Amino acid sequence: MNKCSIAITGAAGNIAYSLIFRILSGSIFMPDTKIDLRLLDIPDTKKILHGIKLEIEDCAFNSLDTITVTDKPDVAFADCDYILLVGAKPRSKGMQRSDLILDNAHIFSDQGKIINKVSKKSVKIIVVGNPANTNALIVCSNTPDIPNENISSLMRLDQNRAKSILSSKVGQHVSSVTKLVVWGNHSTTQYPDISHAQINNSNNFLDTIDEHWIHNDFIPRVQKRGAEIIEHRGLSSAASAASAVYDHFN
């Protein structure tokens, strides 16, 4: 039997709630891998975390070995194999991701220092909390003993959004879209690039799409999709973000 430890910050939040059950479904790791799950959030969420713990127990996941609920980062991160830094101040209506930098910088700085002190030096870290790319850099700056290549920020949500919009445009299933790239930051300055994309292993679809749609519809829609969801839902992306973390992890 193999074991691995996974810590999730912001564990009482909507993204983590959607993510936890996908991870424990057992499809990421080998079937004989047992997960030591650590759920971390602020003290005010203690009651919520306990409720989530009860739900997890009720699922009777074969993949789950142990579960720890804590508000202490050093407990959550101790000897960890994987850390998902989901917890951060969320973006609300009218805010850009850059507005979150000052509010979240100290969170990721402090967590980085603790990770560097107590986690395995081989730990793999995925930064989800926005602005994810900046927060990942902050974590890197505070984890000198952990290789930079072990730390990544979430861009898969933008790629998934781009694939979905493109597949809808050409009338093909999203699984047929490959080699689509999103350059830049997880922000409105990102550049979804379909110049090398393929649909069913062919780039012939490019002949059916005009430049006006690419530059005036496709790219802005991907760039502003997060704001569009907030406008309609009143909250930032949760289930789609969790699904993207799962894809990134997988």
Which residues does each PLM region occupy?
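Redox-cofactor binding/interface segments in oxidoreductases and associated redox assembly factors
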Residues: 83-85, 127
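Rossmann-like NAD(P)(H) cofactor-binding subdomain of soluble oxidoreductases
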Residues: 96-165
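C-terminal substrate-binding/catalytic lobe of Rossmann-fold NAD(P)-dependent dehydrogenases
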Residues: 143-152, 157-250
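Conserved N-terminal Rossmann-fold NAD(P) cofactor-binding segment
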Residues: 25-80
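Conserved NAD(P)H cofactor-binding loop of Rossmann-fold oxidoreductase domains
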Residues: 87-89
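N-terminal Rossmann NAD(P)H-binding glycine-rich loop of SDR-like oxidoreductase domains
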Residues: 8-12, 20
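Residues forming the Rossmann-fold NAD(P)(H) cofactor-binding site
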Residues: 17
